[in-house]
Curated annotation (Swiss-Prot):
The keyword Lipoprotein does not apply. It comes from Aphanothece halophytica. This is Sarcosine/dimethylglycine N-methyltransferase. Changing M172R: Almost inactive. Optimum pH is 8.8. The activities remain high at more alkaline pH but decrease sharply at the acidic side of the optimal pH. It catalyses: sarcosine + 2 S-adenosyl-L-methionine = glycine betaine + 2 S-adenosyl-L-homocysteine + 2 H(+); sarcosine + S-adenosyl-L-methionine = N,N-dimethylglycine + S-adenosyl-L-homocysteine + H(+); N,N-dimethylglycine + S-adenosyl-L-methionine = glycine betaine + S-adenosyl-L-homocysteine + H(+). Transmembrane segments: none annotated. The keyword Ribosomal protein does not apply. Monomer. Pathway: Amine and polyamine biosynthesis; betaine biosynthesis via glycine pathway; betaine from glycine: step 2/3; Amine and polyamine biosynthesis; betaine biosynthesis via glycine pathway; betaine from glycine: step 3/3. The record marks P171, M172 as: Important for dimethylglycine binding. GO terms for molecular function: dimethylglycine N-methyltransferase activity; sarcosine N-methyltransferase activity. Inhibited by n-butylic acid and S-adenosyl-L-homocysteine. Keywords: Methyltransferase, S-adenosyl-L-methionine, Transferase.
């Protein structure tokens, strides 16, 4: 097993566990798994998460109904349902967690969107799709889990049509991040490094893509993990026994690592947009 495969397997095992599924489903509101954009510090996580999706959609608002979109690392599929409902896009969800994918399919059925959204089990390092299949690629806070981010970008390039756009968010390290500063965060997600704006721009340039913008929102990373920690502490007892006490205690430690890393000045988060000529 390669290192990238091992990282992917760890991500799958983690998100498929009962404790992780129960935690994310209850705390995030059942639709999303990504970082929210907050107007106030005590805003519901669900509302902030939807605001992130809406803001990313603004970056691709010129695409018409019927646009083919691929969501890489789609989680519970909340973003796909938003795009299908509000923009009429046809969305394919690719995700490594079988548990999340089942929830995704179930909600699509319940919300009458099964004809607009397809859900695929798999890794974004080896996409099960034909070349030049999609108009738009989308990803939220997922690529960090890859042990081979360059391969993810190469696969994205393969399935994206000429004239297409790639919009994504990802918790990143700054381009000048000293070695060791983010170790507590990296150890938690079993990685040696995070991506960076410079890294993604460099790979995109090598692929012949055009950099469109980076909508920098790093402060929201701190806002988000602080809000999740508040909710965990407020609902600690109710989350058990669905989530084990050991899991919740580890999550508290991990959330504090993310908050401290975000405040360190060596993390970055926001919306990146690239265009493939």
């Amino acid at each position: 097993m390669t290192k990238a495969d091992a990282v992917a397997k760890q991500a799958q095992d983690y998100y498929d566990s009962g404790s992780a599924d129960g935690f994310y489903y209850r705390i995030w509101g059942g639709e999303d798994l990504h970082i929210g954009i907050y107007n106030t510090p005590d805003e519901p996580i669900y509302d902030a998460s939807v605001r992130t999706v809406s803001r990313i959609c603004d970056k691709i608002k010129n695409w018409p109904a019927g646009t083919k979109v691929l969501d890489l690392g789609a989680g519970y599929g909340g973003s796909a349902r938003y795009m299908a409902k509000h923009h009429g896009f046809d969305v394919d969800c690719l995700n490594i967690s079988l548990v999340q994918n089942e929830r995704n399919r179930q909600m699509n059925q319940e919300q009458g969107l099964a004809d607009k959204i397809r859900v695929f089990d798999g890794s974004f390092e080896e996409l099960p799709f034909e070349n030049k299949s999609y108009d738009v690629l989308w990803s939220q806070d997922s690529i960090l889990h890859s042990g081979n981010r360059r391969k993810v970008m190469e696969e994205a390039d393969r399935v994206l049509k000429s004239g297409g756009d790639f919009v994504f968010t990802d918790p990143m390290q700054t381009d000048n991040c000293p070695e060791g500063v983010l170790e507590p965060v990296l150890a938690r997600i079993h990685l040696d490094s995070l991506g960076s704006v410079g890294f993604y721009r460099q790979v995109a340039e090598e692929l012949g893509w055009e950099f469109v913008e980076f909508d920098e929102q790093t402060h929201q990373l701190v806002n988000h993990y602080s809000r999740v920690l508040q909710e965990l502490e407020a609902h600690y007892d109710q989350l058990q026994p669905e989530c084990s006490q050991e899991y919740l205690d580890r999550m508290k430690v991990g959330l504090n690592h993310w908050i401290n890393a975000g405040k360190s000045g060596y993390m970055a988060w926001g919306i990146l947009k690239f265009h493939k000529p």
